[in-house]
């Protein structure tokens, strides 16, 4: 009777995890020990998948342990990699576990780029393998009974978990085997079998009949519920339904039997007989309907023996009234089983291969934090650099410090010499010219990469739209138009960035042209530089004046402030703080990370003091520039004013401004070159991302096309089978066939008119024909139609050949016997005529052949009637 239901495993196609995961690791994590370790872990994960789902598995706990370790690893990997169609696209293909396939195509399968789908299918295999291991247990000992119950409850929990999560994991209709209805039924079946195992253990341990009856009745209840859930569905194999119905009756019979024993102990002999009669009826039902699936002979014998003895005792001794079945109290229920919840890790030997890799949520928080940090640092540094540029502009407009250095009127001020030296050391006009010439080439390279990336998306999207229009509702996958929205948005952002870069390049070129003449002068040797600066009358002796001393002091303080800002910039850039621990702690405590609150607080603590120092420095510079402008006004009043001095001062101002713009332009051009080079790397990654998703979509498209072709092949070519021709179904006379058949009537054969031969002697009787009296033979052959009718096969056999017009026969000569033809042979497909050959006629008066001697047989051709 111990017939248990086990679930077949799902089968999958091979998937290369190494290439896409390693590629993501190389693009995301810097080279070093962590990157090498993560790539090694990817190799181990790929091997683990092959061991868990890529080969046939033994029905043993070690195989189950391997599958559970793979499931645990999937749960660990899921939050650490962006498994989405638009980022890290891995397509997993699984076949329906219950579909046997057809002659027109393979079994039903589903391919989805979803790690949740992979987890669901692996969990299904955990439940299936657990059910197989439980079914293989030898239930003759306690350890095997405990193991079977444990594995059945594990299988029930796995199927129940799939029922609750499959729709949210897939976001589309799953295959039938993992649909909520199917796995819900499987979970209930596994629970019923676990309860039955407890019933068997209680019976083996000879527990009280009241307890055993409750356990059996609860098992019957589980089996009944499972049968109700699946009796109108064609999802499980056909053997499952009768087994569930039989188990329901059997466990109910056990419950009634043990309850009858309890009634006997309580001296309720009528109730005992009533329950035994009900148990006997249940067993008879199983024997009559489900005998090929379960054997209940021993149970039936035990119940019948008890029933016979109870009736005998009651008839002779007790005379207790036997109550009707409806009047019996229902048997109690006691459930000792429950679905084992799916709590990761399932495996006791699990070790996380990616233990050091932080979850994707933390990675995203770190990315946002680093962006906030960069924005804060860049804005602070930009403030300091803008302050320096502003101060240099003010000094250049006042011709400082050259004005206080140029007292002779014909020598080059030291500050101008220093500026000229700086320009020459940085490459002069050649460097800035080369940087400007390189920009268009770098820009064009980035534009080509971006256009090529978007072209990948456009071509695949056009193909997807064409197939959607062709197959309509059959084309069930995420439309490329919707899937590529994030990538197209990213591409649009890149295009805007390039447009802004083009505008910035134009501004840089315009500034270069405005100050090119001053920069060219600064690049000249000292003698040529001195000649390019107009001379003026010597200024009044002002070296010892108080205003010059004040100006020089103020200028020195301004230089100190510039140096202070440079030091602050270096200090701010050198600050480094790892937020991983804080984000991981928040994730562990709250289950989520409030990145903004944590990041703002930490950034304020780390950079608050630097921000304060920068603001103090800027405030001091503002006051200092005001003092410099006031002192310069007094200095200007003291200087001798003439046209030559004014012209010289104007040239010196232009040279100072040219120097400042040269430094700024070189910095901008180098920054622009770095920007384009960095953007090239980013665009190459974007191109790679587009290429990867297009390749994954093409693979998914090929799988879907294959599935659609197989589904089309499995569909019937017509709504119903046409009516079978009459000559293939019921053997009847030609006249009846022609009159009743609904198919077109074939044209009759051509019968050649020939001279009637003289009567021939009767041939010997055919071996297959039964002996017939001469009178009967004459009566049966009055006309050709009669002869034809006599050659018809019995009505309950398939005709030996296709029917055709009857051939003439002669008195005393039975119609010819046709050679058996293959069933379905159609004589109308061939143009030959079958006419009986002319047989030798003896001269008149010659005696006929003796009856015991056979006549001469002519040679026969294949497929022609024998003579």
UniProtKB/Swiss-Prot annotation:
> Which SMART domains does the record match to this protein?
BRO1
BRO1 domain residues:
3-391
CDD domains assigned to the protein according to its UniProt record, in alphabetical order: BRO1_Alix (cd09240), V_Alix (cd09235)
Kindly give the PROSITE patterns that the UniProt entry links to this protein: BRO1 (PS51180)
PANTHER family linked: PCD6 INTERACTING PROTEIN-RELATED, PROGRAMMED CELL DEATH 6-INTERACTING PROTEIN
InterPro entries the UniProt entry points to: ALIX_V_dom, BRO1_dom, BRO1_sf
Which Gene3D superfamilies does the entry mention?
alix/aip1 in complex with the ypdl late domain, alix/aip1 like domains
Q: Where is the composition biased (Low complexity)?
A: 729-744, 767-791, 852-861
Organism, by scientific name, is Xenopus laevis
Q: How is it modified after translation?
A: Phosphorylated on tyrosine residues.
Q: Which UniProt keywords apply?
A: Cell junction, Cytoplasm, Cytoskeleton, Phosphoprotein, Protein transport, Secreted, Tight junction, Transport
The question of whether Ligase is a record keyword is answered with no
Biological processes annotated in GO: mitotic cytokinesis; protein transport
Give the protein's recorded name: Programmed cell death 6-interacting protein
Say what the protein does: Multifunctional protein that may be involved in endocytosis, multivesicular body biogenesis, membrane repair, cytokinesis, apoptosis and maintenance of tight junction integrity. Class E VPS protein involved in concentration and sorting of cargo proteins of the multivesicular body (MVB) for incorporation into intralumenal vesicles that are generated by invagination and scission from the limiting membrane of the endosome. Binds to the phospholipid lysobisphosphatidic acid (LBPA) which is abundant in MVBs internal membranes.
- Ranges of compositional bias, category Polar residues: 792-803
Pfam family for this entry, one: ALIX_LYPXL_bnd
Compositional bias of type Pro residues: which residue ranges?
A: 756-766
| Region entry Disordered, spans | 714-809, 835-867
Spell out the GO cellular component terms annotated for this protein, sorted alphabetically and separated by semicolons: bicellular tight junction; centrosome; cytosol; endosome; extracellular exosome; Flemming body; melanosome
The protein's location, in the record's own words, is: Cytoplasm, Cytosol; Melanosome; Cytoplasm, Cytoskeleton, Microtubule organizing center, Centrosome; Secreted, Extracellular exosome
Q: What is its main location?
A: cytoplasm
